[in-house]
A protein has these predicted regions:
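Amphipathic alpha-helical assembly/interaction segments
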Residues: 1-117
């Protein structure tokens, strides 16, 4: 797939999977699962939306991808605040998550504009 949003989301998901090994503290397995699922959901939903084309369903999957990016950012911020993820690991992932969310948002805006014409 040649979408920048998908490429960056895929790279982010791989980094989150690797970074999740640094999580520590109580309920680390549950936290790791939530973080990884949210991260992997982003490129998966971009791909599904792209696969459905310029239509309402495509836009819906891009909306889910954008929401998953917001969820991932929240999990990363909570993990950092709770001391479960070191700031040196959390902050770059948060910055990349925000970038991916912005790219997905712009893609969604583009699809919605095409749908309205």
């Amino acid at each position: 797939m040649d979408l920048l949003a998908w490429k960056k989301a895929t790279a982010l998901a791989a980094s989150v999977v690797a970074g999740s090994r640094m999580l520590k503290g109580p309920a680390v397995t549950a936290t790791r699962s939530q973080v990884v699922r949210a991260a992997e959901s982003i490129p998966a939903n971009i791909a599904e939306g792209y696969g459905r084309g310029i239509c309402g369903d495509g836009a819906r999957f891009l909306t889910v991808a954008r929401a998953s990016a917001a969820e991932l950012e929240s999990h990363l911020r909570v993990a950092e605040a709770a001391g479960r993820l070191p700031p040196a690991a959390a902050r770059p992932l948060i910055a990349r998550t925000r970038e991916v969310r912005y790219l997905v948002h712009r893609l969604l805006v583009s699809v919605r504009l095409r749908l309205s014409h």
